[in-house]
A protein has these predicted regions:
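Residues that define the transmembrane beta-barrel architecture of outer-membrane proteins
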Residues: 83-91, 156-161, 168, 208-212, ...
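Outer-membrane beta-barrel "beta-signal"
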Residues: 436-452
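Residues on the lipid-exposed face of transmembrane beta-strands in outer-membrane beta-barrel proteins
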Residues: 91-97, 162-167, 214-218, 249-253, ...
């Protein structure tokens, strides 16, 4: 389990295991989802005559291998041994059609997993600081995910990550269905982007997970715009209720060479106000967001500010960013004991919903994107918890090896003593009378992607 909650099961495909899994997947595809997908495609075809349509297609096929090493007092070490090896195969096909102002989109995903993590994660207790083992739509309006198989070391599923229809004019956009939006000015930490944000330490940030929502935008003649969303969800009992939905408005404007954002939202049952700005400073860009959330018990402040700058060093183009983040929902004084975390319901709820990925309050993130060659980008990152002194050091290497082919390599090294966020928080579970931790020695990831 990687500190910071980024936990992506991914599998070890022996050729025979992969062939068996794909064969099983082809035989077990859900009839209901298959029929639903066919009806979507027929609906897209019926938008208008074929000659008048504009079609957009694309996608990828990705293979990922992940290896992780664990210390002897890690709870994962007790379940799976001193190391885990996992592989994942991911296929995505994006289909869109446009006619005059109308458009419709359907993005299909298939994932096949084989490895140690899929197997041992079934035995992990329901810890709120860990994400779901597999993607699901339990709390979304539409259930567009079907798990084909989940047994032993293998799992497979398919889903529709986008499914929406919309209408666009010169000044307005209206769209309903499964889609994704990104708000806020944070480069690494994103407190204003509370709709399925990326984990700051995620290696592949190509697609956000979609949510079922009604989205609208009005563009003014001066370039300013107003966006509004209504994200519709189901509660734990499957009921559609306003207690778990989100309604938000965000105004984006320009003043001279600066930009600003103003946000007002009701997210679940909390009221949120926010503001952000971007402007040039000293040859670089200064940006940030401030958020104020009124919960049932308190008013919580969060904020992020970053400075990015580009330069040339040793004939290499470099773009660097330094970002500070204050998480008002985080644990004070670096106390991450199970008892203390259990008392912080606001934090635990946001981690469980995938809105936050940090346990503490004060953070510093440093990142530099170095263009080693036009086809090789090297990115060292550091995520530092200023409250407890722990950190996660990460190096990502991106290689464009051929037309439409890309390799990603990444190494993660957590630093910190036991009881700290990145050094390993205590699970509250004892093995042989000794405490266990959510800790990792180091991990390595390899990903090969083909785009079409």
């Amino acid at each position: 389990v990687k500190p910071g909650r980024h936990f992506e099961p991914g599998p070890i495909f022996h050729c025979r295991s992969l062939a068996a899994l794909l064969s099983e997947a082809s035989l077990c595809v859900s009839a209901s989802l298959r029929e639903y997908s066919i009806s979507i495609l027929l609906g897209l075809l019926s938008v208008t005559s074929v000659s008048a349509q504009t079609w957009d297609t694309g996608g990828y096929l990705k293979y990922r291998f992940q290896y992780a090493s664990y210390p002897s007092d890690s709870y994962t070490s007790f379940l799976a041994g001193s190391s885990t090896a996992d592989n994942a195969l991911a296929f995505r096909y994006n289909l869109g059609v446009r006619h005059k102002g109308w458009d419709a989109w359907a993005d299909y995903q298939f994932q096949a997993l084989y490895g140690d993590t899929i197997e041992f994660s079934r035995d992990i207790p329901d810890l709120p600081v860990l994400p779901d083992r597999l993607p699901d739509d339990d709390h979304r309006l539409f259930d567009l995910t079907h798990v084909i198989t989940d047994v032993d070391k293998r799992a497979a599923l398919h889903r529709l990550d986008r499914l929406s229809a919309g209408y666009t004019t010169d000044q307005t956009v209206i769209r309903f269905g499964r889609q994704a939006i990104s708000w806020g000015n944070g480069m690494i930490f994103t407190p204003m982007d509370f709709f399925n944000p990326f984990d700051p330490a995620a290696i592949d940030k190509e697609y956000k997970t979609g949510d079922d929502m009604l989205y609208g935008q009005y563009l003014q003649s001066n370039g300013n715009d107003l966006q509004g969303v209504w994200v519709i969800r189901r509660d734990d009992y499957g009921n559609v209720t306003s207690e778990v939905d989100s309604i938000a408005l965000k105004y984006h404007g320009f003043v001279s060479d600066a930009e600003y954002d103003i946000l007002a939202a009701r997210h679940f049952e909390d009221l949120t106000l926010g503001g952000g700005a971007i402007f040039n400073l000293g040859g670089g860009v200064l940006r940030g967001d401030l958020m104020l959330t009124a919960t049932a018990d308190d008013t919580v402040f969060s904020g992020v500010a970053s400075y990015s700058y580009s330069w040339v060093w040793w004939n290499k183009n470099i773009s660097g960013v330094a970002e500070v983040f204050y998480n008002g929902f985080g644990q004070p004084n670096g106390d991450y004991s199970p008892e203390s975390l259990a008392e912080n319901e606001d934090l635990i709820e946001r981690i469980a919903r995938g809105e936050l990925f940090t346990l503490g309050r004060e953070y510093l993130a440093l990142s530099a994107m170095i263009e080693m060659t036009p086809l090789w980008i090297l990115t060292p990152n550091a995520f530092i918890n200023l409250s407890d002194g722990s950190a996660l050091v990460q190096v990502v290497s991106q290689h464009d090896i051929a037309q439409d082919w890309q390799i990603l390599l990444a190494a993660n090294l957590p630093i910190g003593s036991r009881g700290t966020e990145y050094g390993g928080i205590e699970t509250g579970i004892e093995v042989g009378g000794e405490p266990t931790y959510l800790s990792t020695n180091w991990s390595f990831t390899f990903q090969l992607a083909w785009y079409f």
